[in-house]
Amino acid sequence: MAMKYVAAYLMCVLGGNENPSTKEVKNVLGAVNADVEDEVLNNFIDSLKGKSCHELITDGLKKLQNIGGGVAAAPAGAAAVETAEAKKEDKKEEKKEEEEEEEDDLGFSLFG
């Protein structure tokens, strides 16, 4: 199901209509020349009959909180090794930059 149906339905609710019909949602979508699949829209409207939009949003947020991020904490030892390696690489890069600067100034300066 496309989010356009959800958005149009919620726009109707925000406009003061707690239970918008298929026709009203079609009018909202028609205002922006969106394609409407009648079967999908009818199924969506039927699934929301008798339900409050605010309750659905609250229930959905609770479900999202239970899902979690799916990211596990990295071991602290691995992070320390990575930072030490990064510091070594930074020092090498700094030395290379200093050498390049010294090579650039070989007395061939036009203005100094």
Swiss-Prot record:
It comes from the Eukaryota. It holds the Pfam family Ribosomal_60s. Residues 81-112 are annotated as: Disordered. InterPro entries: P1/P2_N_sf, Ribosomal_P1/P2, Ribosomal_P2. GO terms for molecular function: structural constituent of ribosome. GO terms for biological process: cytoplasmic translational elongation. Residues 96-106 have a biased composition (Acidic residues). HAMAP family: Ribosomal_L12_arch (MF_01478). Belongs to the eukaryotic ribosomal protein P1/P2 family. This is Large ribosomal subunit protein P2. It comes from Plasmodium falciparum (isolate 3D7).
